[in-house]
Regions:
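Generic N-terminal targeting/processing segments that precede catalytic cores or assembly contacts
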Residues: 2-181
Length: 182
């Protein structure tokens, strides 16, 4: 039996499901907020984020903190009506100075795993932060700094964490993929 909803066979009308955001989009917003605070001393709230398709949503901050040479922002993930295990999770990003000439580096914070087996799009030993979120984070850090296309990336260390991420990841494929710690 095929249901007809929203004018298309077998598909629900878009108005029936509430859209949400990926963990990567939430991490991007938190990173941009933290870096903006490092640059200006103020956390933007809401935080604008430019997505790869050109959309510019805003994200509300859940928490913020700043210390000598670092800033941290937290976004509560809203996955919409998607049955995402990380819905409601706190996505925490700390931005601090990186290696001179090293561009943007990534570190796994509490609840974000580390890749331990080959076969994923990132090398063994890297934090399990996928290539697209890395690209989005770097692009939004560049926007926050007002860098033009020719300027090198800022030298920053971006540490991404997920509250209770290790427990959440145990319910996913991460352990079978060799991602340990979240």
């Amino acid at each position: 039996m095929t249901e007809q909803r929203g004018g298309r066979r077998g598909q629900l009308a878009s108005s029936e499901l509430r859209p949400g955001w990926t963990t990567g989009a939430c991490a991007t917003a938190a990173a941009r907020a933290a870096y903006t605070a490092l640059l200006t001393g103020q956390f933007p709230d809401p935080v604008p984020v430019v997505l790869p398709q050109g959309r510019t949503p805003t994200f509300a901050l859940t928490a913020e903190a700043q210390g000598e040479g670092w800033a941290e922002a937290v976004i509560t993930k809203d996955a919409g009506d998607d049955p995402d295990i990380t819905h409601g999770a706190l996505v925490r990003v700390r931005v601090s100075a990186g290696e001179p000439g090293g561009g943007v580096g990534f570190r796994a914070g509490a609840g974000v795993g580390t890749i331990t087996l080959p076969g994923l799009p990132l090398p063994v030993g890297e934090p399990a932060i996928n290539p697209m979120p890395r690209t989005m984070i770097i692009a939004n850090l560049r926007l926050a700094a007002g860098l033009d296309a020719e300027a090198p990336d800022p030298d920053l260390l971006v540490t991404v964490g997920i509250n209770d991420g290790e427990q959440l990841a145990a319910k996913t494929l991460n352990p079978r993929l060799g991602i340990v710690g979240g």
